[in-house]
Amino acid sequence: MFREYKMYKFFEQVKQETYKVFWPNRKELIASTLVVVAAVFIFSLICLVLDYSIHNIMQLLLTIGK
């Protein structure tokens, strides 16, 4: 019984907290999404360039040893 009351109280508090959350409007949501997508794209390009550079440097070092 006590355990069920604690669960009920927990979910009641969760419900109360959702009313306090700042929910973005459609314009803010789209702007934030575009920023995240752009940041991921830029970071992916940086990782691609670094990976390609390291690969080429390693290939160069391995061919020098032959």
Swiss-Prot record:
Query: Which processes are annotated in GO (biological process)?
Result: intracellular protein transmembrane transport; protein secretion; protein targeting; protein transport by the Sec complex
Q: Which controlled-vocabulary keywords does the entry list?
A: Cell inner membrane, Cell membrane, Membrane, Protein transport, Translocation, Transmembrane, Transmembrane helix, Transport
- Top-rank taxon of the source lineage equals Bacteria
- Gene Ontology CC annotation, any one: plasma membrane
Bilayer disposition of the protein: Single-pass membrane protein
- Could you say which residues form the signal peptide? none
Could you list the residue ranges that cross the membrane?
Answer: 29-49
Q: Give this protein's Gene Ontology molecular function annotations.
A: protein transmembrane transporter activity
Main localization is membrane
Spell out the Pfam families in the cross-references: SecE (PF00584)
Location in the cell: Cell inner membrane
- Which InterPro entries does the entry mention? SecE_bac, SecE_sf, Translocase_SecE/Sec61-g
Q: Which family does it belong to?
A: Belongs to the SecE/SEC61-gamma family.
The protein's role, per its UniProt record: Essential subunit of the Sec protein translocation channel SecYEG. Clamps together the 2 halves of SecY. May contact the channel plug during translocation.
Subunit structure, interactors included? Component of the Sec protein translocase complex. Heterotrimer consisting of SecY, SecE and SecG subunits. The heterotrimers can form oligomers, although 1 heterotrimer is thought to be able to translocate proteins. Interacts with the ribosome. Interacts with SecDF, and other proteins may be involved. Interacts with SecA.
What PANTHER family is this protein classified in? PROTEIN TRANSLOCASE SUBUNIT SECE
Q: What is this protein called?
A: Protein translocase subunit SecE
> What gene codes for this chain?
secE
